[in-house]
Amino acid sequence: NVSRINMRTFIKNANNNQEILCYDFYKALCWCYYVEYANFNCQLPFNAELTSDGYHQGGLGNGLTTFTQTNAWEKFNNYTPITPCGYLNDIGNFSGVKELSIPTIVIDDSYTINAVTLTPCKYRGFENLFGDYYKNLEGIILQKPDANSANTIYATSDNTKFNNEISNKEIRGIEATDNGYIKIFVFGDKAEIVPAIIGATSITYKSDYHNTKNDINKKEILTGGGSANGNNAGFSNFNSIDNVDTTHSNSGFFSCVRYNSI
């Protein structure tokens, strides 16, 4: 239950050179996958073998998103990350999956967690970019100009502008107003991955789910989905329901260190 403003404080207390992973950097990672694997469905079964032409096939598997038993994630560890720290270190900076087995656990007389085998994944060294827990992205805010309009997307990768203001950010487009599976991204001239049109399924078009809310408050973006989200999760799973600095037990952030080129 940490708000984004407190996330900023905590990460600076840990290391002043660190920051929350921002939308623009996350977007670049997503496009790296989309181009390398030539699909938008990162939950396709993992296949380590290349095609005869030397291309990747499949995706990164289900990740941790099959921990879908009702209330199991909460009972297991109160919505904290499931993968032990360093569990995927042997994959290095490559892409791959590794089984993680959770045994049957009797919580009390009224609740038992059923045994399940999950497949946490890495993409080019980044662990569990989807599933596990919702990622709160820095440098992006959504807000309607009035009650009858859709959310305008305000974004920046300038870390001096990482705050809750919209006046110091670029307008990148308009977010879809409906909930559902994503058909079309905003794209624009900076390859935005915010949903523009809904109307797909979990196995067609962008394959990931979009949740939004109809009010005029400033919204933050939670992405990737959580461990209980099943097919709704994925790189482009976008949730813009929450007001800026809302707290959630099943959301967190990725940290990064920015290096200036020499």
Segments (PLM) and residue ranges:
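Disulfide-stabilized, aromatic/cysteine-rich ligand-recognition loop
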Residues: 2-5, 9, 17, 21, ...
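Short aromatic-cysteine micro-motif
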Residues: 1-129
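Generic structural signal for well-ordered beta-strand positions
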Residues: 134-135
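Extended alpha-helical regions
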Residues: 103-114, 144, 156-158, 164
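Extracytoplasmic/secreted cell-surface and envelope-processing proteins
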Residues: 29, 145-146
